[in-house]
Amino acid sequence: TDNGDGTYTYNVPVREGYTWSDGNPITAHDWQFIWDTVTGLNLVGNWLNAYPYLCEDDEGNAKNCVVSIVATDDYTVSVTFNYDPGLSTWQYGAAQGPALSKAYWESIATDRDSLLAHDAIDAPVSGAFVYDKLEQGAFYTWKYDPNTMWYGGTTTIYDAGGTSVDWDNGKAPAFSGDFGNTTGDSFSYETGPFVGTVEFTLYSDQDAAYLAFQNGEVDFVLNPLGVKRNTFNQLAQVPGIELVQNDPLGMRYFAHNTRLFPGSD
């Protein structure tokens, strides 16, 4: 919605009937709570990717930001920007912003230090796994929640780029829908989980992690950085490992100067 004053608002419905793992309902108030917490306690890091609330730069100049997130009723979230947001800041930004359970976190998030110091091992989640054990510097596990509603369903991917979802497990509110162009050849897969426990082994560096991978001790490595060249070359020598890489120094973004020809045409 164009509010006519330079701001734009998205009114997003929250489907009723979904719950956190502790049984509390997931509502629009959870999104307003996390917005109030992020802005009230000046949380930064990844929170700014989803909820860029800083509307001025270091020199006091105005910049694009989220102005407010409000629960207009129990199942509607209104997100307001001070500009008309594009794909990266709406669809891949605030529209995918996380929420946390207000019922659990409200008494904890009273100040920044208390929030960051809290042991969240028992925090409720919206998923099939709950937090289990954490051994600092060694491992971290998730375990399957037998009472979860977050399981099952069929997802179909089409050659034309579209996706279909059919989810009716008898516990969560049933949902089905088609997104994009659902024509052409397709393949489908069932959503799990198909295991009872997931273990994340913690390693001190890449070398140790990829050595464990080579030895079959772990199934994959979660690595926020690129693979080092010598590690890449070592993996290339291991039978059964297939390597896929992007073109080095390739183009990631392409920009047009719309003020000059041909971009202005």
Regions found by a protein language model. Give the residues of each.
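Extracytoplasmic/periplasmic ligand-capture domains
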Residues: 6-46, 59, 65, 88, ...
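Surface-exposed binding/hinge segments that line
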Residues: 11-13, 32, 48-111, 117, ...
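N-terminal lobe/hinge region of extracytoplasmic solute-binding protein
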Residues: 1-5, 124
